[in-house]
Amino acid sequence: MLIKVKVFPNSKREEVIKKSEDSFEVKVKEKPEKGKANREVLKVLSSYFKIPESKLRLVKGFKKRNKIFEIK
């Protein structure tokens, strides 16, 4: 299953907002440098979906706000 994620780094709090069945907004506190925000998004999404991080994979958008994740 693929999901679309719009990431908001440098946020005051971490949260996941569901926009549609396969579209989410994720706010994280980390800065978008050296993959820190991407790693934090993985943690937040795994907590939201209640699955291990190993079941999530960033497919597209490594250096962009709009990303596509695969849930295995």
Predicted regions and their residues:
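Absolute protein N-terminus
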Residues: 1-2, 72
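Compact, glycine-rich, soluble single-domain proteins
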Residues: 6-8, 22-49
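A generic beta-sheet turn/junction motif
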Residues: 9-11, 62
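A structural signal for short hydrophobic beta-strand segments in well-ordered beta-sheet cores
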Residues: 16-17
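C-terminal structural segments of small proteins and small subunits
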Residues: 34, 40-72
